[in-house]
Amino acid sequence: MIRKLKNKHSNQGLTMIEVIAVLVIVGILAVVAAVKMSNTSDYDLASQLEVVKGHLRLAQAKALSSGSSWGINFTTSTTYYMFQETAPTTPVLILGEDNATVDLVTKKSALTITSAPQTITFDAYGSPGTTTLTVATNGGNITVTKNTGFIP
């Protein structure tokens, strides 16, 4: 008869080394996450840059749908507004904004338009013209492609 040897030691727990290793790994991950979350200025610049791109695309869409020119006028490094061809000095309220003139300081954004003053106008076909336009900011450049009006 062959008897099975029973293991008298139970494997139902964790060793102290395993517990310490898990705690060290969790601690390292917590520190990395805290460092990433503490500096949100890069995320602010990137998100506000996308908002400005969205406003440019809105002006382009309005030009396409209305059959008349629309544009964005970057008046200072922190303010801009959308306008229609018939009244280029009269700001038009941008969808989702509280005021017709967008003020980046009021929005508590660190984004600044370094190429201001600058005006970008889209014709009835959504084209900015025959020249590629660049809106320079401290968060990166916004390129409006000639003829097509593509904004990457």
Predicted regions mapped to residue ranges:
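Type IV pilin-like appendage domain
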Residues: 70-124, 141
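Aliphatic-rich helix starts adjacent to a transmembrane/signal segment
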Residues: 17, 23-61, 65
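N-terminal leader/signal peptides at the extreme start of proteins
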Residues: 1-14
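Alpha-helix exit/C-cap motif
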Residues: 54-81, 149
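Low-complexity, S/T/G/P-rich flexible repeat/linker segments used as non-globular hinges
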Residues: 127-152
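Residue-level detector of conserved, well-ordered beta-strand and adjacent loop positions
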Residues: 38, 123, 145
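Structural motif detector for alpha-helix initiation sites
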Residues: 16-19, 146
